[in-house]
Design a protein with these regions (language model features):
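Short beta->alpha linker loops
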Residues: 30, 54, 77-81, 102, ...
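Short, acidic loop-to-helix structural element flanking the phosphoryl-transfer center
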Residues: 53, 68-98, 108
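A metal-dependent, Asp-based hydrolase signature
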Residues: 14, 24-71, 80
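Hydrophobic alpha-helical core bundles mediating ligand binding, dimerization, or RNAP-core interactions
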Residues: 3, 8, 31, 60-67, ...
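Active-site neighborhood of HAD-like aspartate-dependent phosphohydrolases
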Residues: 1-21
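Substrate-recognition "cap/lid" segment bordering the active-site pocket of phosphatases
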Residues: 73, 97, 103-157, 163-174
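A short, structured active-site edge motif that brings together acidic residues
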Residues: 19-27, 50-55, 119-133
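Alpha-helix N-cap/helix-start and coil->helix boundary motif
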Residues: 1, 32, 83, 103-105, ...
Length: 177
């Protein structure tokens, strides 16, 4: 949310997403899709809507740059228990993968900053935002990760942090925690 707000300010837009508004906007997965949903919710004419929609790629690039800076500054910690879970899975010799609708740049920055510079290499597959045409709750991102792992769904477990993510993992046939 803060990175979006930073991007809006940098791009000269008067928008500020509160925690409450962002909570509602999180029902739309994918940053570009979330921006589109927000623009579509505005009480504006079709010409202004199209002009704003045309700015989505640049707004998203700007948001990603702000978010990556926040990650590298240590402002975006891992959720409790994630480090232990990753360490235990690695110690057990399990293959790890990531299936996320965020950008690969954000994933790699978060891994390197929170787990160490070599952490991106711990994952046998990373499926990120633009890899999947349909975002969660569609199963696409999980299907891509499974394909890259050459695994059937019953040979993997998904750990999720959102209802849309759980729906996506289950739709892909994965046991989900």
């Amino acid at each position: 949310r803060l990175a979006f707000n930073d991007a809006f300010a940098e791009q000269g837009l008067p928008w500020r997403w509160s925690r409450e508004r962002y909570g509602v906007l999180l029902r739309t997965t994918g940053g570009k899709e979330r921006l589109g949903a927000y623009i579509d919710s505005l009480d504006i004419g079709p010409e202004r809507r199209e002009a704003l929609r045309a700015r989505i790629p640049e707004l998203h690039r700007c948001k990603t740059a702000h978010y990556t800076r926040r990650i590298r500054a240590g402002a975006v910690p891992l959720r409790p228990g994630v480090r232990r879970l990753v360490d235990e899975a690695r110690a057990a010799g399990l293959r790890l993968a990531i299936a996320s609708t965020t950008t690969l740049e954000n994933i790699e920055a978060l891994l390197a900053t929170t787990l160490g510079a070599d952490a991106p290499g711990w994952f046998a597959a990373i499926a990120a935002g633009d890899d999947a045409p349909r975002k969660k709750p569609a199963p696409d991102i999980y299907e891509i990760a499974l394909s890259r792992l050459s695994l059937p769904p019953d040979a993997a477990v998904a750990f999720e942090d959102s209802a849309l993510g759980v729906a996506a993992a289950k739709a892909a046939g994965l046991f989900t925690v």
